[in-house]
Amino acid sequence: MKVVKICGIKTVEAASVAIDNGANLLGCILVPNRARTIDLEVAKQIARMVKRDRNPPPKFAGGTSTQHFEQVAQWIIENGPFLVGVFRNQPKEEVFRIAREVGLDFIQLHGSEDKLEFLGTEFGLIPRYVVPDELDLLEEQSLSLTQCVSLPLLDSEVGGEGKLLDWTFIEKLPTKAILAGGLTPENLPTFDNILGYDVSGGVETNGVKDSLKIIKFIQKGHAQSS
């Protein structure tokens, strides 16, 4: 089974659909002044919903560096759902303050910030790497990322814009990761080194989360196998 992340959630209703249908990760945009930026009070409500829908997860035990991301993905599948807050080039102190206030499980870094500065906290880490420009950086940082509960994300430059990646680069990926970038329920690729799928616009209709598309994406994502 692959990890499925529904991102850009702004409402309790969309979160409820994602949780009830087995999404492993729910993503909320906490970058100011974006179309999908969530109200902090709504984010707190969703954090409570996520925690109510799971047992207290066991501490991630870690493992070999070569299998680390695979083990993190399996831990997420077995113990989720988890709430992810998406940040972009925001001060580290602000990121951690908001993460603690909301009650996040994971921090997703979507800008040019130094990902390694965010290691060693109580939060899991989902660092975004631009394909193909930052694949060398991912290879360089992958060993350091195994120091925490982390899962790399491959995406386009900004993300959330529905732009498909050039999947020929995925086949040559030096490590395992989750995939974003223009995904829909109809176009999920299967690669040995892809551990999951991240979607936002691909489950929307006219800019609003579409329950039927969310359900279909989760079903299709979980049905994919390496």
From Swiss-Prot:
GO term, biological process aspect, one: L-tryptophan biosynthetic process
UniProtKB keywords: Amino-acid biosynthesis, Aromatic amino acid biosynthesis, Isomerase, Tryptophan biosynthesis
Gene3D superfamilies linked: Aldolase class I
GO molecular function terms noted in the UniProt entry: phosphoribosylanthranilate isomerase activity
Keyword NAD: no
Record-linked Pfam families: PRAI
Pathway per the UniProt entry: Amino-acid biosynthesis; L-tryptophan biosynthesis; L-tryptophan from chorismate: step 3/5
Catalytic activity: N-(5-phospho-beta-D-ribosyl)anthranilate = 1-(2-carboxyphenylamino)-1-deoxy-D-ribulose 5-phosphate
The protein's enzyme class: isomerase
Catalytic activity, EC: 5.3.1.24
InterPro entries (alphabetical): Aldolase_TIM, PRAI_dom, RibuloseP-bd_barrel, TrpF_fam
Family as reported in the entry's similarity comment: Belongs to the TrpF family.
Family matches, as PANTHER family: N-(5'-PHOSPHORIBOSYL)ANTHRANILATE ISOMERASE
Protein name: N-(5'-phosphoribosyl)anthranilate isomerase
Source species: Candida albicans (strain SC5314 / ATCC MYA-2876) (Yeast)
